[in-house]
Amino acid sequence: MARIAGVNIPTNKRVVIALQYIHGIGPKLAREITSKVGIPDDRRVHQLTDAEVLAIREAIDRDYQVEGDLRREVSMNIKRLMDLGCYRGLRHRRSLPVRGQRTHTNARTRKGPAKPIAGKKK
């Protein structure tokens, strides 16, 4: 198994697919990285040389923010919104949907399990 950005990527998959196991790299970014390094799309991870793995690792470290750094930045952005006290920050603080979705009936994922109301029987 090759280890890139602190993640063990599977050896039997194509490089473009295997790179997507890294948090912050999707299909488009994976293709961009492989074309930048000069690796064909049909190459599998176990066929890569050590130099190619090193080139991929350096390209990711140099040009992209992935894994722990990306998670940290996202959480810091949410914390900043909460500290500012803006509308989006308040919605995050109250664990409600942030992007304008309705909450009267849905939003159970964000609000958690339904809480029973005392005295309401049919």
UniProtKB/Swiss-Prot annotation:
SUPFAM superfamilies: S13-like H2TH domain. Residues 93-122 are annotated as: Disordered. The keyword Protein biosynthesis does not apply. One of its GO terms (biological process) is translation. InterPro entries: Rbsml_uS13_C, Ribosomal_uS13, Ribosomal_uS13-like_H2TH, Ribosomal_uS13_bac-type, Ribosomal_uS13_CS. Gene3D superfamilies: 1.10.8.50, 30s ribosomal protein s13, domain 2. One of its GO terms (molecular function) is tRNA binding. One of its GO terms (cellular component) is small ribosomal subunit. Keywords: Ribonucleoprotein, Ribosomal protein, RNA-binding, rRNA-binding, tRNA-binding. The keyword Transmembrane does not apply. Belongs to the universal ribosomal protein uS13 family. Located at the top of the head of the 30S subunit, it contacts several helices of the 16S rRNA. In the 70S ribosome it contacts the 23S rRNA (bridge B1a) and protein L5 of the 50S subunit (bridge B1b), connecting the 2 subunits; these bridges are implicated in subunit movement. Contacts the tRNAs in the A and P-sites. Part of the 30S ribosomal subunit. Forms a loose heterodimer with protein S19. Forms two bridges to the 50S subunit in the 70S ribosome. This is Small ribosomal subunit protein uS13. The gene is rpsM.
